[in-house]
Amino acid sequence: RRCFITPNVRSERCPPGQEVCFTKTXDG
């Protein structure tokens, strides 16, 4: 599971077909 740092965005939803999560801390 990879996390990318996004500005003012904190979502634990992953797009279909990819295990990518968007978190503000990028930890998880």
From Swiss-Prot:
Keywords: Calcium channel impairing toxin, Calcium-activated potassium channel impairing toxin, Disulfide bond, Ion channel impairing toxin, Neurotoxin, Potassium channel impairing toxin, Secreted, Toxin, Voltage-gated calcium channel impairing toxin. Expressed by the venom gland. GO terms for cellular component: extracellular region. Disulfide bonds join 3-21. It is found in: Secreted. GO terms for molecular function: calcium channel regulator activity; potassium channel regulator activity; toxin activity. Gene3D superfamilies: CD59. Coiled coil: none annotated. Belongs to the three-finger toxin family. Long-chain subfamily. Type II alpha-neurotoxin sub-subfamily. Heterotrimer composed of this alpha-neurotoxin-like peptide of 8 kDa, a neurotoxic phospholipase of 16 kDa (AC Q7LZG2) and a serine protease inhibitor of 7 kDa (AC B7S4N9) at an approximate stoichiometry of 1:1:4; non-covalently linked. The heterotrimer blocks the voltage-dependent L-type calcium channels (Cav1/CACNA1) from the heart, and the small conductance calcium-activated potassium channels (KCa2/KCNN) in the chromaffin cells and in the brain. Is very toxic to mice. Is composed of 65-68 amino acid residues. This is Taicatoxin, alpha-neurotoxin-like component.
